[in-house]
Amino acid sequence: MIQVLLVTICLAVFPYQGSSIILESGNVNDYEVVYPEKVTALPKGAVQQKYEDAMQYEFKVNGEPVVLYLEKNKELFSENYSETHYSLDGREITTYPSVEDHCYYHGRIQNDADSTASISACNGLKGHFKLRGKTYLIEPLKLPNSEAHAVFKYENVEKEDEAPQMCGVTETNWESDLPIKKTSQLNLPLLEKRCIELVMVADHRMYTKYDGDKTEISSKIYEIANNLNVDYRPMKIRVALIGTEIWSTGNLSKVTLSADETLDSFGEWRERDLLKRKSHDNVQLLTGMIFNEKIEGRAYNKSMCDPKRSVGIVRDHRTRPHLVANRMAHGLGHNLGIHHDGDSCSCGANSCIMSATVSNEPSSRFSDCSLNQYSNDIIYNPWTSYCLYNEPSKTDIVSPPVCGNYYLEVGEDCDCGPPANCQNPCCDATTCKLTPGSQCAEGLCCAQCKFIEEGTVCRVAKGDWNDDHCTGQSGDCPWIGYYG
């Protein structure tokens, strides 16, 4: 394992709190001004990286000291990530930029087990973190020769439209004859990890809205993808950005006021064009179009591995990439086959990702209903999940491994997160090695840190699909993948 570089940022609160200001996130009614002072504890003679693998921030929120830990999201990009745009004569231009030293991070607040964070450190600190159940945003103030940042609650951002926005997918309300299990009862870490290799496309209206600035558009896409990884981590789904495409000279599929027509045309373009030149699992269209009937997005249901229907469309909100990410997470949920939440569904927040009415305050949580449906039904459907098993191998991840980030990487036996959060007795959170006497730490064929006996059914058949059985040599349940 590498030595994790610890960087301390002291954020000193400015002598006043602002009452109102226009920021990139919108018009903010109440905010704190802080000045990040970076103090780096590097060994003498060591070379500082441009973007460290791990950082620590110490600052105050409402006078309360907090510690924010950040780790680079090393699973943000797939190994063969590409970017495509078009010349004035319509010629496709595709490049394969180096993305190893990127500036997008996940994190958490110390001593707050419920906290999450998604931060860009490209030009100052920009993103959001959750503290004591409240969502806070941080972003740099655009002042000359100043390191000032604003910190504010999401609820203090003036909303663009107080009217409820709707998801365009209908007839997908959650129903089940099975009792709803609490999240803690699902034992979700034992599910096999899957990977959605995702392409994001920015349409021509979005291109003109950003004044043709392809770099800014790409940065927004990276922020959205970074947020998606946070949302899908509880399901053990990695969302890997495998490509971006910007329709710089005009739309390549029909984009109209009708979300249904736009979705259908986009799916046809994917099957006809994109799939023939770029291997991927799902593609999402970011559009500047404001659809009829206050629809914020549209996606096909139970369509993840379908050549035409594994698509979604989402309206772009220029100032709020975290809001766009929330709505894209909702659409991806439908692609996987997850239904809208019913009245009995809960996630411990005001709204959940699969709520039919899109809240102005985004949620980064799936409800107990969504997690139950995923663990009890969706993972057994080969037609909506088979394409998600070809996750890039551990050796394909180009950045160094970090113990404690929940992802199994080269040199690790297990990774149950930071020591303060790890609840797996089979895994030593400080070394990411198995504890003495343990054979495994997770998997459908792992019980009490030991391999389950050979021949034990680990995945019960659904319909004509055969049972899968443990081998007695691994904690993983082999996917046989055939009908009997």
Curated annotation (Swiss-Prot):
SUPFAM superfamilies found in the cross-reference section: Blood coagulation inhibitor (disintegrin) (SSF57552), Metalloproteases ('zincins'), catalytic domain (SSF55486)
Pfam families: Disintegrin (PF00200), Pep_M12B_propep (PF01562), Reprolysin (PF01421)
Secretion signal span: 1-20
Gene3D superfamilies named among the record's database cross-references: Collagenase (Catalytic Domain), Disintegrin domain
Sugar-modified residues: N80, N251, N301
Keyword Glycoprotein found: yes
Span(s) of short sequence motif Cell attachment site: 462-464
Tissue localization of expression: Expressed by the venom gland.
This protein's GO CC annotations: extracellular region; plasma membrane
Domain of life: Eukaryota
GO molecular function: metalloendopeptidase activity; toxin activity
Disulfide bonds: C305-C387, C345-C369, C347-C352, C403-C422, C414-C432, C416-C427, C426-C449, C440-C446, C445-C470, C458-C477
Coiled-coil stretches: none
Positions of the pro-segment in this chain: 21-191
Alphabetized UniProt keyword annotations: Cell adhesion impairing toxin, Disulfide bond, Glycoprotein, Hemostasis impairing toxin, Platelet aggregation inhibiting toxin, Secreted, Signal, Toxin
Domain Peptidase M12B: 194-392
InterPro entries per the UniProt record, alphabetical: Disintegrin_CS, Disintegrin_dom, Disintegrin_dom_sf, MetalloPept_cat_dom_sf, Peptidase_M12B, Peptidase_M12B_N, Reprolysin_adamalysin
Domain Disintegrin: 400-484
Localization, UniProt: Secreted
GO annotation terms (biological process): proteolysis
Family membership: Belongs to the venom metalloproteinase (M12B) family. P-II subfamily. P-IIb sub-subfamily.
More about this protein: The disintegrin belongs to the dimeric disintegrin subfamily.
Function as written in the Swiss-Prot or TrEMBL entry: The function of this complete protein has not been studied, but it may be similar to the function of the disintegrin domain. A recombinant protein of this domain (409-484) inhibits collagen-induced human platelet aggregation, without having effect on ADP-induced aggregation. It may act either by blocking the binding of fibrinogen to the platelet receptor GPIIb/GPIIIa (ITGA2B/ITGB3) or by blocking the binding of collagen to the integrin alpha-2/beta-1 complex (ITGA2/ITGB1).
Subunit structure of this chain's protein: Homodimer; disulfide-linked (disintegrin).
Name this protein carries in UniProt: Zinc metalloproteinase homolog-disintegrin albolatin
Organism of origin: Trimeresurus albolabris (White-lipped pit viper)
